[in-house]
Amino acid sequence: MSGSGAMLLGLLILVAMATSLDTREICWNHSECDDPSEWCCRMGSGHGSCLPVCRP
């Protein structure tokens, strides 16, 4: 494999990793939740929802 081919493969792997991270559930303690003990959860670019327990 040539050097440029290896670089291209590396870029593809980085892009794949970045997109897989983006679809993960993002959780944080959100002040907009009615219950302070609830956590606001967001899937990728979707809207947040307040849940008592959030899966990391």
Curated annotation (Swiss-Prot):
Disulfide bonds join C27-C41, C33-C50, C40-C54. GO terms for cellular component: extracellular region. GO terms for molecular function: toxin activity. Expressed by the venom duct. Coiled coil: none annotated. It is found in: Secreted. Residues 1-23 form the signal peptide. Keywords: Disulfide bond, Knottin, Neurotoxin, Secreted, Signal, Toxin. The keyword Plastid does not apply. Probable neurotoxin. The cysteine framework is VI/VII (C-C-CC-C-C). This is Conotoxin Cal6.41a. It comes from Californiconus californicus (California cone).
